Amino acid sequence: MRHVLFNRFYQPGIDPVTRAPVPQLRYSDASELLLRLYWIAILAGRVRPSLALSGGAHEPLDAVNALMAGADVVQLVSALLKDGPGRLTAIRDGFTRWGDEHGFASVGEMRGCVSLSNCHHPEGFERAGYVNVLQSGRFPATPWAGH
């Protein structure tokens, strides 16, 4: 059995003139990936069912990160809907190339290597990791901060 975390809910808009729901489809984007990676990494190896990462994966490195966190499968629905089925070949080839370049003999060797259970720096998943980021001053650029 596979469990999909953070599967997207259908979110219709509202037309105030007709007072009716308006169907709309929003693709996932990269900003949605981090929360999913975080929870996959925490749950991998701690729950029995397989874990599927859903939402935010669009690039080969996104799939690498998902597998390293502990996902068994990575859903690429938005990437395929936006770019067509040929995108799957590009992601697969990039994923394979990255694994080869970094010495992974198999997907199984990669899977879960950075999960909370297997990570050499588990504090990165804990509150202390957040405090360290705040203390480091590594913040995204903002227009008002002169970046």
Features from the language model and the residues they span:
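Glycine/Thr-rich beta-alpha phosphate-binding loop at enzyme active sites
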Residues: 1-49, 83
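C-terminal helical cap(s) of enzyme catalytic domains, especially alpha/beta-barrels
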Residues: 12-29, 67, 81-104
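Active-site/ligand-binding-proximal alpha/beta "capping" segment
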Residues: 32-62, 125-147
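Conserved active-site loop/cleft motifs that coordinate metal ions or position small ligands
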Residues: 52, 75-76, 108-109
